[in-house]
Amino acid sequence: MRKAQVTRNTQETQITVAINLDGQGKAELDSGVPFLDHMLDQIARHGMIDLNVAAKGDLHIDAHHTVEDIGIALGQALNRAIGDKKGIFRYGHAYVPLDETLSRVVIDLSGRPGLQFNTTFTRAVIGSFDVDLIQEFFQGFVNHAMMTLHIDNLAGKNAHHQAESIFKAFGRALRMAVTIDPRCDDLIPSTKGVL
């Protein structure tokens, strides 16, 4: 099985994450940020990835460091779990609606970090969660997973729906990208021969 665990300790956060790419969509989440836990659960469930996250952060300041550092640690774990990338589909995409909302996510496990985040949330906060932290999470993830990620919210009036459809689409696109293609299970999915 393709699994990895990462521990990241800084003066701001103490985080341990574990990922199983060949899981059943189970999640054990204790980030200290309830809305983030709800979003991470979407990745696990829709990505069919088992995900464990335990974090303690400087939440007395705000959730920024915790959210960003969880993104970093999860990106590192994904990069380790996919290893040399032999046999993976490499690319993944998903359109996910949620009532009035529609989001598109496209992934390339290219070895080159890049994020295009095209979303204008209808509110600045969801409950007490600053929506700017969603982009911070994905930026940390992308930088350490070494992936190209395009996120586009194509329609939406409810900020919670916008966020949730993005995370669901990300989970489904990631599931597609990390799936092993049985026709090329011993090949790197690149004409360069390396990713």
From Swiss-Prot:
A Pfam cross-reference name = IGPD
- Taken from the UniProt record, the cysteine pairs bridged by disulfide bonds within this chain are none
Task: Give, as in the UniProt entry, the pathway in which the protein acts.
Answer: Amino-acid biosynthesis; L-histidine biosynthesis; L-histidine from 5-phospho-alpha-D-ribose 1-diphosphate: step 6/9
Principal subcellular localization:
cytoplasm
Q: Where in the cell is it found?
A: Cytoplasm
Catalysed reaction(s) here are: D-erythro-1-(imidazol-4-yl)glycerol 3-phosphate = 3-(imidazol-4-yl)-2-oxopropyl phosphate + H2O
Is-annotated flag, keyword Lyase?
Answer: yes
Keywords, comma-separated and alphabetical: Amino-acid biosynthesis, Cytoplasm, Histidine biosynthesis, Lyase
SUPFAM superfamilies per the UniProt record, alphabetical = Ribosomal protein S5 domain 2-like
Q: What is its EC number?
A: 4.2.1.19
Recall the GO molecular function terms of this protein's record.
imidazoleglycerol-phosphate dehydratase activity
List GO BP terms, alphabetically: L-histidine biosynthetic process
Q: Which GO terms describe its cellular component?
A: cytoplasm
In which family does this protein belong, per the annotation? Belongs to the imidazoleglycerol-phosphate dehydratase family.
**Known PANTHER family for this protein?**
IMIDAZOLEGLYCEROL-PHOSPHATE DEHYDRATASE, IMIDAZOLEGLYCEROL-PHOSPHATE DEHYDRATASE HIS7
**What is the protein's name according to its record?**
Imidazoleglycerol-phosphate dehydratase
